[in-house]
Regions:
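Glycine/proline-enriched, intrinsically flexible loops and inter-domain linkers
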Residues: 1-156
């Protein structure tokens, strides 16, 4: 599948880091592809993304309205589910909170918002994945060696 997709529907914008940092009192500390987040399958599901924002200056209120936190994106025709949506709030004192997937929250100055966008489900049995495609997945960091062994039956 396609990784870290933004769609022109709903609230699925992929706002550039520079725009976020110029528009809001945040610093983007991480924006990465989530390894092993796409469901295993003959056709692997697209990987989700991990985004980490640090709140600068003052206490900030935010809101979230996300799906697939309780039931991850499903696989089809024998493919496995993708990873679920996750959000956590890291306070400067080390405390971690997990807000609901729909609602408002407060983050103190210097706190972090960690948001993991779900991966999509795979299609078809993982045992039928093309070995060259799986090798590319490993090389690109989309699939870990552990997941290749567990989900695709690759011997190390």
């Amino acid at each position: 599948g396609i990784n870290c997709v933004a769609a022109g529907i709903s609230n699925m914008m992929n706002t550039p880091i520079e725009v976020l940092e110029m528009s809001f009192p945040v610093r983007v500390e991480e924006y990465s592809v989530l390894t092993d987040s796409g469901g295993a399958g003959q056709f692997r599901g697209g990987c989700g993304a991990r985004r980490v924002w640090r709140v600068l200056g003052n206490v900030t209120r935010g809101a979230v309205c996300c799906e697939r936190s309780k039931s991850p994106p499903f696989g089809l025709a024998g493919g496995q589910a993708g990873s679920p949506m996750r959000i956590s709030l890291e306070d400067p004192d080390g405390g971690i909170r997990h807000p609901l997937s729909k609602g408002a929250f407060t983050v103190p100055a210097d706190g972090r918002i960690v948001f993991e966008v779900p991966g999509s489900g795979g299609y078809g049995p993982a045992s039928e994945r093309d070995p060259a495609s799986l090798a590319d997945d490993l090389k690109n960091g989309y699939v870990s060696e552990e997941a290749a062994r567990r989900d695709y039956g690759i011997k190390s």
